[in-house]
Amino acid sequence: MPDEIVTNKSVTYVNNTTPVTITSSELDLRSCYQDDEVVIEVHAAALNPIDFITHQLCNSYIFGKYPKTYSRDYSGVIIKAGKDVDNRWKVGDKVNGMYSHIYGERGTLTHYLILNPAKDVPITHMVEVPKDENDPYDDFVYAAAWPLTFGTAFSTLYDFKKDWTSDSKVLVIGASTSVSYAFVHIAKNYFNIGTVVGICSKNSIERNKKLGYDYLVPYDEGSIVENVKKLKQSVLENDKFDMIFDSVGNHDFFPVIDQFLKPKAKNSFYVTIAGNNKADYKNISWRDFVSLSSILKAINPFKKYNWRFGHPYPPNNFIEVGNEMIKKGTYKPPIDSVYEFDQYKEAIDRLISNRAKGKVVVKMK
């Protein structure tokens, strides 16, 4: 057990004119939590694009001048539990989850996280990830790496369309992202979707073949639209897709969407989690997410297809699905790199680089 008075270090920022930094505060573990809360000693937290997107969009006049803490994914150990907390959450339990916030003083890139397990869902008990003897990462790293990305992918497949079959076909734009990694595993192993086509760079094709994609199309060898069209005609019997899922930001298919996406009446969807253009994470503005074209796609009653902006706050049951898939070995969270807490700047730079193949995780212990 830790000392009763501890120093809680967190990675924070104030607004989009201030850099991220480590801030420290004294925490009295005897009185820092309510009767319905637990204190989690955080072992690891994962970075996600939403972390520095919200940072760069944070105007102090709108969102205040208090410190805001990075990150949402976490893993750790419960070290304190209030008297009204459900007895399924006990001191010593290893847990992980997604702490949802936009500009919260509490975040997960911190040494101690205080939350209400009945409200701050999803939270779950950690499951062991099947590993071989050469695996360099422990269960805390893996446990922190998957909730938000897995949940976003699951929500996309679960929320918008309910009638997946072995005849269903999906096109994934951005096959190499962590969300798409989860998406293809869920699509093939949970929803039993028959055909998943991915778009990625030619250098990523061999890697992505192993993930479960049925076909892969390079975006850097000619026209994406023409290459997918050729695949559709030659291999897919010219069948259209039930869903086009965009995890990177793309608009190439909109002018010819009726050639690729099934009619609206057949419950087909175009779902994006990134907008119409690939984001420059070093220079983000509100226009990247609230463009006129996005608004028109969302509300235009005359468009011939269903367009949705996928959300990163998924249904609570995704966490149980993820646990089961991890235990069965049908999903293993992808890790790009792991950094110590004091290396948080390097971790952020790695994610901003757009070169990460998997999750960037920061360890506190």
From Swiss-Prot:
Keywords of the record: Lipid droplet, Mitochondrion
One of the Pfam families matching this protein, by short name: ADH_N
One GO term describing the cellular component: lipid droplet
SUPFAM superfamilies documented for this protein: GroES-like, NAD(P)-binding Rossmann-fold domains
Major localization listed first in the record, in broad terms: other
Lineage: superkingdom: Eukaryota
Subcellular localization, as worded in the UniProt entry: Lipid droplet; Mitochondrion
Coiled coil (UniProt feature): none
Family assignment from sequence similarity: Belongs to the YIM1 family.
Protein name: Protein YIM1
Source organism: Saccharomyces cerevisiae (strain YJM789)
